[in-house]
Amino acid sequence: MIQQTLCLIKPDATQRNLIGKILSHLEEAGLTIKALKKVQLNQEQAEGFYAEHQGKEFFAPLVEFMISAPIVAVVLEGENAISHYRELMGATNPEQRKAGTIRALYAISGRENSVHGSDSEQSAKREIAYFFTPNEIL
């Protein structure tokens, strides 16, 4: 099934000029870029995007990290794009990352893990709509 999912290239990766490498990794794996924009989130935007985590101990540090530098929001499309992209991303936990995944290659830590990806169809729809209007997705 053809799906769309959201990829965020996080501040740790944008600051280290890894945008092109990450996008190449995704395209070489068969995913198509349908929309892309570089964004500097403010506190309110970051809190809104991660609202489901409000009240958790990692919420405030995550928001601080996500507003520390620009991010790149990308809509990816492909066969089973959500699960395919999550496999390409690799695990959040550094000890569980498989070699060759984006996080194994580029992540600095559990929080500074270079990329975010939608975890379900419902999340993908909500997250894509957070960053893109329908006419921006080509």
Swiss-Prot record:
Its EC number is 2.7.4.6. Its main location: cytoplasm. Its cofactor is Mg(2+). It catalyses: a 2'-deoxyribonucleoside 5'-diphosphate + ATP = a 2'-deoxyribonucleoside 5'-triphosphate + ADP; a ribonucleoside 5'-diphosphate + ATP = a ribonucleoside 5'-triphosphate + ADP. It is an enzyme of class 2 (transferase). One of its GO terms (biological process) is CTP biosynthetic process. Keywords: ATP-binding, Cytoplasm, Kinase, Magnesium, Metal-binding, Nucleotide metabolism, Nucleotide-binding, Phosphoprotein, Transferase. CDD domains: NDPk_I. One of its GO terms (molecular function) is nucleoside diphosphate kinase activity. It comes from the Bacteria. InterPro entries: NDK-like_dom, NDK-like_dom_sf, Nucleoside_diP_kinase, Nucleoside_diP_kinase_AS. ATP binds at residues 10, 58, 86, 92, 103, 113. The active site is at 116 (pros-phosphohistidine intermediate). One of its GO terms (cellular component) is cytoplasm. Homotetramer. Belongs to the NDK family. Major role in the synthesis of nucleoside triphosphates other than ATP. The ATP gamma phosphate is transferred to the NDP beta phosphate via a ping-pong mechanism, using a phosphorylated active-site intermediate. This is Nucleoside diphosphate kinase. It comes from Actinobacillus pleuropneumoniae serotype 3 (strain JL03).
